[in-house]
């Protein structure tokens, strides 16, 4: 059986905070990878995270690498007014568009509605786009435009 080639894009911060908010639990990256790789040939897999420089985060990032993710880090920026910045929306979008030509499917793990434009663009290129997100915390706009929406439920949690 020939498996479809897939690009996997994980917005680590979004997944962490939505899983914690909804379930007070963490996402199970190992189970997620097993489920995907059973049905898909994972051509590229990126996990986008913020680097705060602490050891616990480095250990987690190394676990992601061991699973098979290419971990992309952006420094955590604390502004003078106390607010913080550290999102990967542009980086995820650029990687999605760069690698879409190599794959049949794109798997996006994020509930961020800003990605609805990206999902539409990928579908316009003939790609199947599956979005994983936490129910109630995933923007309706991205659920509507996705080829398929997969709710992150307790089966995908630690």
Describe the role of every protein-language-model region.
Residues 1-88, 128:
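Domain-level signal for Mg2+-assisted phosphodiester chemistry and nucleotide/NA-binding surfaces
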Residues 53-158:
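Nuclease catalytic cores that cleave nucleic-acid phosphodiester bonds
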């Amino acid at each position: 059986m020939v498996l479809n080639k897939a690009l996997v894009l994980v917005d680590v911060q979004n997944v962490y905070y939505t899983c914690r908010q909804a379930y007070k639990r963490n996402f199970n990256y190992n189970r997620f990878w097993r489920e995907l790789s059973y049905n898909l040939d994972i051509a590229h897999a990126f996990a986008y995270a913020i680097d705060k420089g602490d050891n616990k985060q480095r250990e987690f990032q190394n676990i992601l690498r061991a699973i098979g993710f290419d971990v992309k880090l952006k420094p955590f920026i604390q502004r003078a007014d106390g607010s913080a910045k550290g999102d990967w929306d542009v980086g995820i979008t650029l990687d999605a568009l760069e690698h879409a030509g190599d794959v049949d499917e794109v798997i996006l793990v994020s509930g961020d509605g800003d990605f609805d434009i990206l999902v539409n663009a990928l579908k316009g290129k003939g790609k199947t786009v599956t979005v994983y997100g936490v129910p109630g915390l995933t923007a309706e706009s991205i659920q509507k435009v996705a080829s398929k929406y997969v709710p992150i439920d307790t089966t995908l949690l630690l």
